[in-house]
Amino acid sequence: MSNSQVQPETLSEYLAHLPMTDEQRAELAGCQSFSELHERLSSKTFDAPTEAAQASVGKRLILSTAEELQDAEMLVLDASGRVSMKATPPIRRTKVVPEPWRTNILVRGWRRLTGRTNPPQPPKDANVLPAARWRTVGSIRRYILLVLMLGQTIVAGWYMKGIMPYQGWSFVDLEEVLHQPLLQTATQVLPYALQTSILIMFGILFCWVSAGFWTALMGFLELLTGHDKYRISGKSAGNEPIPKDARTALVMPICNEDVPRVFAGLRATFESVAATGDLDRFDFFVLSDSNDTDICVAEQQAWLDVCREAKGFGKIFYRRRRRRVKRKSGNLDDFCRRWGGDYKYMVVLDADSVMSGECLTSLVRLMEATPDAGIIQTAPRASGMDTLYARMQQFATRVYGPLFTAGLHFWQLGESHYWGHNAIIRMKPFIDHCALAPLPGKGAFSGAILSHDFVEAALMRRAGWGVWIAYDLPGSYEELPPNLLDELKRDRRWCHGNLMNFRLFLVKGMHPVHRAVFLTGVMSYLSAPLWFFFLVLSTALLAVNTLMEPQYFLEPRQLYPLWPQWHPDKAIALFSTTIVLLFLPKLLSIILIWAKGAKEFGGKFKVTLSMLLEMLFSMLLAPVRMIFHTRFVLAAFLGWAATWNSPQRDDDSTPWSEAVKRHGPQTLLGFFWALLVIWLNPSFLWWLVPIVGSLMLSIPVSVISSRVGLGLKSRDESLFLIPEEYNPPQALLATDQYTHENRWHALNDGFVRAVVDPQQNALACSLATSRHGQAEPIEWLRQERVRHAIKVGPAGLNNHDRLQLLSDPVALARLHEQVWAEGHAEWLDAWRASVKADPHAPLLPLKPVSLQAQPA
């Protein structure tokens, strides 16, 4: 560590970036070294100059926020006597022990046969109330749903069988088939094998469509009549005082997110809760798993800013994990282990979530009024995006979504879904029963559970607690991906997670409803390859009919030929029925809006036109999603990594180059598929045009729909308008305002700032949580890290090196002092360039005015 004579220009530049008065700067301008400067700032003297910068952390912090930090008693001394920021409450550990999964039913059966006992089924909580009437009602409703789905599917399957050209399976003699030449066997059997495969896939897909239809239909009736005596939101009058012991933690797990937007939503939610007068019942936690050092530093500054501006010190907490275990579920486990015992309830927020104070206080009251509820999930409303694609998706979820969520509630009641965010959770049963162990084994479907929400809901229900959807509770919001490719990137992760969850289908003690939830989660993505192979087999059957001579006689001494049949009346009836099942829910949604008032959707004409345009757009995108989801499913089974490095885009639009890269293979597939069908039978192309045409148009559709300009123009024309745009609630208005302000003051090049900038370094040192004590190997490692950072400069450090420095307050303070004391140009120039590139004017000049006037 150098303690040489300091250059006056460098010292003046350093002091210029500390919020001091001119008199204070003048007092410090005579320091002979940076070690002396830090000693005078800290009012301490040190034998080793290496510790002086660490000691001045507290003084550098309170120069700009003295009153707020002192009033909230935010600065404390850690076990080593270093100044640290009290960014989290005191730890009071709670035992969180995940139960190992036993997913192999064969192993359980073998243990039973050999006389060895299996582990007992996890007991239900003794304090859960006796089974309520809604559970019997829910079971009866689901049996009715099963009958409706299967009945509809059987009738449709019978019609589909009658449409098939070959009706002679009963004449195929399997014994004779096995003794005849292979080519002859293939000629006879191939058409029937294709038909049978098509029929099976059709049955599965039609049953899936039928489930959605009946769910939407019952949701329509629920919303139209407004009569639902099992509605969870009716359990509370909405004005009961919240008991003092009903403390609630709002936790927001984040990982390398858009920092300005995250903390804008957090501040809007915080201020909305404060406006209710019940802020003393809530605490807010930002739980960061970020590993990008620039983002980490930006998060720290954003947390300090929101605490200062919203007066959130002691109510808004921030923690960044150093050991990123089990992703989001592990982040929540760590929170529960450290602070879960301090709270009765927990509300989980996504990085883009916004919730109103009225919604949050209502959730707490509902939990208090429903003592057997373990989770109450809200129905988040999508808003806040401006691209054409996102606005159409927002419109679809806002118009059609309420039917499906109300329908889910009708069929499931208190054995429903949990979507992982914008929901309130009862802490004690969650800690006792919902910790997630890794899935056993090796391969793509083992390890940490990706889609934790469905599993946590299933475990909560297994323990005897209810899981409800408060589908009619307003004030819960989220954002959707801005374009198709970003949505597909998210879908790949969800696809892998849902396929992993299906391993839990036969785990002991799971409620049948949640086994069905695991199945529907798989079908959400498995339906894509089923549909794709259904189309491929249909094309193959067309090729067989065109290229192969029909086999009219399938067995010896057959008197009458088997003629291929065609029943256009049945085909039209089946096609019409399928169209009704697919599109009637959308029409019912519009009818419901007409009945309740369409003004906030742009009026009856505009909302109807928007629905028609959205239907056309969804038809264009359905085959594109089919191909991608098919690829995702195959990738998961083949063990390919679920990653997709998509470039960052400031305007959320998709460049043509990326669209060609992602959609190019689909375009070629659609083109050659169309040529094949034209060669086989041109008349069949009309049936396949919606598929191959969509694939060939995927590139321009993906690019054009990602444009912000088209989205804003459609809003000006009142197309795809939603109530949150027509009359924005205060929480969303505040989020937009704070996002704009945060972007204007966003911190760029965070790691360089944390090393060089006097205040950013002080903040980073105060929030670093290195537990290393005094030991020779540790000291040697610190010296090596600082020496390496000085040698290679900011551009030469990899992300691991940066994280190690950012997590060690001693090494970070030493690096800061040495960069300034020795005038290392690589670090100082990078910092100066970063400050100069800020979109807003710097708070302080890079150099004092007197120095700026001097010639170089």
Swiss-Prot record:
Keyword terms: Cell inner membrane, Cell membrane, Glycosyltransferase, Membrane, Transferase, Transmembrane, Transmembrane helix
Pathway as given in its UniProt record: Glycan metabolism; osmoregulated periplasmic glucan (OPG) biosynthesis
Listed GO MF terms: hexosyltransferase activity
Transmembrane segments: 144-164, 198-218, 517-537, 574-594, 608-628, 691-711
InterPro entries (alphabetical): Glucans_biosynth_gluTrFase_H (IPR023725), Glyco_trans_2-like (IPR001173), Glycosyltr_2/OpgH_subfam (IPR050321), Nucleotide-diphossugar_trans (IPR029044)
Keyword DNA-binding applies: no
Membrane topology summary: Multi-pass membrane protein
Pfam family, one: Glycos_transf_2
EC code(s) of this entry: 2.4.1.-
Catalytic EC class: transferase
Protein localization: Cell inner membrane
NCBIfam families in UniProt: PRK05454.1-1 (NF003955), PRK05454.2-1 (NF003958), PRK05454.2-5 (NF003962)
PANTHER family linked to this entry: CELLULOSE SYNTHASE CATALYTIC SUBUNIT A [UDP-FORMING], GLUCANS BIOSYNTHESIS GLUCOSYLTRANSFERASE H
Similarity comment text for this entry: Belongs to the glycosyltransferase 2 family. OpgH subfamily.
Protein name: Glucans biosynthesis glucosyltransferase H
Gene: opgH
